C-alpha cells in the first residue's frame, strides 16, 4: 500500500534539504561566510515534519557556484498553474496573498490529500497545493488525521520575490 508522506510528515523529515550547519560549513568553504544572514533570508525556511530551518539545496548550490543571490529554485519550473489559481482565485485568495507578501501569516485548513479537481475556487485547496510544493511553510499546526488548521507564511525571500514578479506581470500585460 502507498503511504502519503508530505512536507508536514515526520517520516523522512531528515532526508530533504540542507541544515543550517551544512550551509554555514559550505559558505565557509567557499569564502562566503559573511553572507550567511542574506543566504538565510533568501533560501532558508523550508520545513519537513518537525524539522525547520531547512535550506533549498538547488538554490544553495547555485548560489555557491555563482556567488549571486537570485531566484534559482522557483525558476526551475513553470509556475503557470500557481499563477492561474491566484490570478483567477476568489477575493479571499487574493487578500490572503497580499497578506503573505507583506510578511504576515494566514490561518487555513489544509488537506494533504487534495486532487486536481478541487483547486478551482477552493482557497484551502490552493493553500494545500502551495504548502505541498514548498511555496508556503508551516509556522504552527493543529493537525487531525489527513488535515488540520495551519498558520502559514511564505517560505523565504526567493519565494516572495517570485510571487511579486508574477503579480507585477499581471499588470505589465494590461493594455489601457
Q: Each predicted region: which residue ranges?
A:
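Phosphate-binding site recognition
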Residues: 1-176
Amino acid at each position: 500500500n502507498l503511504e502519503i508522506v508530505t512536507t508536514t510528515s515526520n517520516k523522512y523529515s531528515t532526508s530533504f534539504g540542507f541544515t543550517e550547519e551544512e550551509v554555514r560549513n559550505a559558505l565557509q568553504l567557499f569564502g562566503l561566510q559573511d553572507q550567511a544572514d542574506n543566504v538565510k533570508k533568501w533560501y532558508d525556511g523550508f520545513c519537513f515534519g518537525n524539522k525547520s530551518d531547512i535550506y533549498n539545496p538547488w538554490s544553495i548550490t547555485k548560489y555557491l557556484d555563482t556567488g549571486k543571490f537570485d531566484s534559482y529554485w522557483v525558476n526551475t519550473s513553470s509556475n503557470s498553474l500557481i499563477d492561474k489559481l491566484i490570478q483567477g482565485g476568489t477575493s479571499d485568495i487574493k487578500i490572503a496573498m497580499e497578506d503573505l507578501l507583506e510578511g504576515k501569516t494566514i490561518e487555513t485548513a489544509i488537506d494533504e490529500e487534495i486532487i486536481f479537481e478541487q483547486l478551482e475556487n477552493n482557497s484551502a485547496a490552493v493553500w494545500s497545493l502551495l504548502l505541498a510544493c514548498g511555496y508556503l511553510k508551516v509556522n504552527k499546526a493543529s493537525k487531525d488525521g489527513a488535515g488540520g488548521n495551519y498558520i502559514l507564511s511564505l517560505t523565504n525571500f526567493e519565494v516572495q520575490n517570485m510571487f511579486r514578479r508574477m503579480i507585477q506581470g499581471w499588470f505589465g500585460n494590461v493594455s489601457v
